[in-house]
Amino acid sequence: MISIIDLVNYLKNEKVGGVIYPLSFPVNSPDACSTVNFVSGTPTRGGVGKVYLQVMTRDVHPAKAEKASNDIRSFLEKRTDFLLSDMQVILVECQNFAPFYLGMDENNRHLFTLNYTFTMGE
């Protein structure tokens, strides 16, 4: 089975997206960073299932946060045939036309998000 940690480690190993955390932003994390979280998934049918993920980025300037979000998208979009742990990723598709602006957090950092569908094979 795939885990958030698998994807976070994959992005870190590929040097994509800068500082990335699983699930949420830690209290002492830098202003410029991202999180990865599961949104939902589908049952496996014929050895294929889908996992829906959200990648949220933040930074003190909106252009920097949006760029980080787009950098991750450029790396993941239409990526095919790679392994996360022992699971094959058949295809990654971004579900948004552009990064969606969520507003500012309690420390005035700008937040953007993109949602992805990972088609997975057993």
PLM features: what roles do these ranges have?
Residues 48-65, 110-120:
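Oligomerization/assembly interface segments of phage tail-like spikes and tubes
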Residues 42, 58-68, 95:
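Short, conserved turn/kink motifs that form compact alpha/beta structural patches or helix kinks used as
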Residues 68-74:
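Short amphipathic alpha-helices in soluble, non-transmembrane regions
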Residues 10-14, 51, 59, 75-79, ...:
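A generic structural signal for ordered secondary structure
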Residues 44-47, 105-107:
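Short, solvent-exposed beta-strand/turn "edge" segments of beta-rich domains on protein surfaces
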Residues 1-45, 67, 79-91:
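Small/polar-rich, solvent-exposed N-terminal microdomains that initiate assembly or binding
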Residues 78-122:
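Acidic-leaning, charged glycine-interspersed low-complexity segments
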